[in-house]
Amino acid sequence: MAENSNGALGCVVRCLSSESELQELCREEQLCCAELGVTRKNLSDFEVEYLWNYKKVQDQELYLVKWKYYPDSESTWEPRHHLKCNNLLKQFHLDLERELLRRAKAAGTKKTAVRCPRRLDQSLSHYLVLKAKQRKRLRQWAQQLNAKRSHLGLILVENEVDLEGPPRDFVYINEYRVGEGVTINRISAGCKCRDCFSDEGGCCPGAFQHKKAYNNEGQVKVKPGFPIYECNSCCRCGPSCPNRVVQKGIQYKFCIFRTSDGRGWGVRTLEKIRKNSFVMEYVGEIITSEEAERRGQIYDRQGTTYLFDLDYVEDVYTVDAARYGNISHFVNHSCKPNLQVYNVFIDNLDERLPRIAFFATRTIRTGEELTFDYNMQVDPVDVESSKMDSNFGIAGLPASPKKRVRVECKCGVSSCRKYLF
């Protein structure tokens, strides 16, 4: 930020050096800069950023250390007993062992354990540098995701499969982003209930001739295909109302992880999720169907499936989560999923613009991957037996992502349909 001769703030000039480069410069010149985190206290400190080579000389283990805030050229060999970074040492050897096993498998051997060599060849050392830098980028990405999330659930990121880093040009959002030609009108009226569960006829679902969707524990009890009407910002009831579930956001800790079977990124839960519990929303940019057709032609060439029609009553709008989205962007398809989609209405009652919520179809164990069916359908017998009004039918379900190209399914379940669409 520049200042003019009168001390007033002037134009903003983009810095030509990165933050780490400026930190390195400060340390080289022995200059303190509070804005860069370089103070007198840590000016001469040495912090290990990562380990990127290893050798064993006689009986002494030595590690080539990249020091934080210093260029690669100033990396030094250090004996193990000088290093206090136990987690980095453990991760270094874990990465090394995994890569050695991968190479052994590629060579056709069936080793289940490998011995660390006395010296690493150049390709191994190069791999460990790339892996260390990737971990740094993924940590930074996880920090960015958690800084942007407005929900309770924490997000972790993990890649123990390859060297893929954070996706480019992906922006984390917590609610729909309204695109050109789309207008969302917020509701101006709400229920007057003091206890929304005691008055079946007067609360928000009853006003639209529908049953309450949740039980007292916030678990969905209506069948897939029926809409969910939650209490809104104009309702008299408070935030503890049992009819406020989706609007409270994600409550669970999740991990975005790299799959080992070619399905890209996936999402696993780090907590047990009970059957019929709300898990997450599918959010993205709301665009017109015409714009979706245009973008779809581009996505066809990329093999992506982030376009999700909002055709609860008519196909007018589409959610595009390719660039703007939340953690649902990374949820994979399965022909036998553990998530089910519901249309939800809260502060906007336009039936062309429902919110899309995922609920657990069964109890989901800690560490289990979350999936939904990209080509979801409902049993017509179930629809007919639980029919609530003459307008309900198969078309009442939220659509799957746009069915544009024939994509091979890799879900691996016994009932796999072989193709997504």
Swiss-Prot record:
* One Gene Ontology cellular component annotation held by this UniProt entry: chromosome, centromeric region
PROSITE patterns linked to this entry: CHROMO_2, POST_SET, PRE_SET, SAM_MT43_SUVAR39_3, SET
Q: What is its main location?
A: nucleus
| Positions bound to Zn(2+) 3 | 196, 231, 237, 241
Question: Which family is this protein grouped under?
Answer: Belongs to the class V-like SAM-binding methyltransferase superfamily. Histone-lysine methyltransferase family. Suvar3-9 subfamily.
Q: Regarding domains, what does the record say?
A: Although the SET domain contains the active site of enzymatic activity, both pre-SET and post-SET domains are required for methyltransferase activity. The SET domain also participates in stable binding to heterochromatin.
Q: Which gene encodes it?
A: suv39h1
Name all Pre-SET domain ranges: 189-249
Q: Where does Zn(2+) 4 bind?
A: 335, 409, 411, 416
Which Gene Ontology molecular-function terms are recorded? histone H3K9 methyltransferase activity; histone H3K9 trimethyltransferase activity; zinc ion binding
Q: Where is the Post-SET domain?
A: 405-421
Which residues take part in binding Zn(2+) 1?
A: 191, 193, 196, 203-204
- Domain Chromo stretches: 46-104
Which cysteines link up through disulfide bonds?
none
Q: Which domain of life is it from?
A: Eukaryota
Protein name, per record = Histone-lysine N-methyltransferase SUV39H1
- Residues the record lists as binding Zn(2+) 2: 191, 204, 231, 235
What does this gene product do? Histone methyltransferase that specifically trimethylates 'Lys-9' of histone H3 using monomethylated H3 'Lys-9' as substrate. H3 'Lys-9' trimethylation represents a specific tag for epigenetic transcriptional repression by recruiting HP1 (CBX1, CBX3 and/or CBX5) proteins to methylated histones. Mainly functions in heterochromatin regions, thereby playing a central role in the establishment of constitutive heterochromatin at pericentric and telomere regions. H3 'Lys-9' trimethylation is also required to direct DNA methylation at pericentric repeats.
Query: Which biological processes are named by the entry's GO terms?
Result: cell differentiation; methylation
Protein localization: Nucleus; Chromosome, Centromere
Q: What's its EC?
A: 2.1.1.355
Q: Name one Pfam family in it.
A: Chromo
Give the catalysed reaction(s), semicolon-separated.
Answer: L-lysyl(9)-[histone H3] + 3 S-adenosyl-L-methionine = N(6),N(6),N(6)-trimethyl-L-lysyl(9)-[histone H3] + 3 S-adenosyl-L-homocysteine + 3 H(+)
**Assigned keywords, A-Z:** Cell cycle, Centromere, Chromatin regulator, Chromosome, Differentiation, Metal-binding, Methyltransferase, Nucleus, Repressor, S-adenosyl-L-methionine, Transcription, Transcription regulation, Transferase, Zinc
